[in-house]
Amino acid sequence: MVWMPALTSKIGISYSVFYLLAGIILYWLFSEYLPSPLPKENESAILHLTELIVIISLMGAGIKIDKSFSLKNWSLSLRLVFIAMFLCIIAAAAMGYFFLDLTIASALLLGAVLAPTDPVLASDVQVSPPNEKSDSETRFTLTSEAGLNDGMAFPFTWLAITFAALAEGKDTSLLYWFSYHFVYQIIMGVVVGIILGKVT
């Protein structure tokens, strides 16, 4: 629906809100013909669907960026991801633990979910299409940071899962989380991203 961005730019509401409302209405009208939206009833399908949505949204943010990577060009984005986002995760987790009486696992999950910027909902203040030189540093920083921080937040989601598993006595450890979910997956994500970026 190519007319949707033009409409939402006039009324000041993200088109994601309209798609969400459309999904609610469609399920309300045709619920007997559609699968259950409850995650526990369709775990595998919902897992892969949410992964696909994250990949598409991050790809959409990535293809808008035409500034070559360097520490100088990306310094603000990297500071937002590696400093500001980590502080937001810690702050949200601390508030959840001390003020909402959540467990450590639930508090960490709250921080990991709330801290990242959504690349879809933030699109109204992001960069215009590639090769247009009018974008400000602020708009570039918001776009690049929105793409980077989702990937950097995933290890903390797994940290919350690890704490929950440890509380239930399951066979896992913080060392495994750090070596696999934090070090290995981040490095492989960067390597695959560089290779695909060069190839395409």
What does each model-found stretch correspond to?
Residues M1-T200:
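Transmembrane helical cores of multi-pass secondary ion antiporters/exchangers
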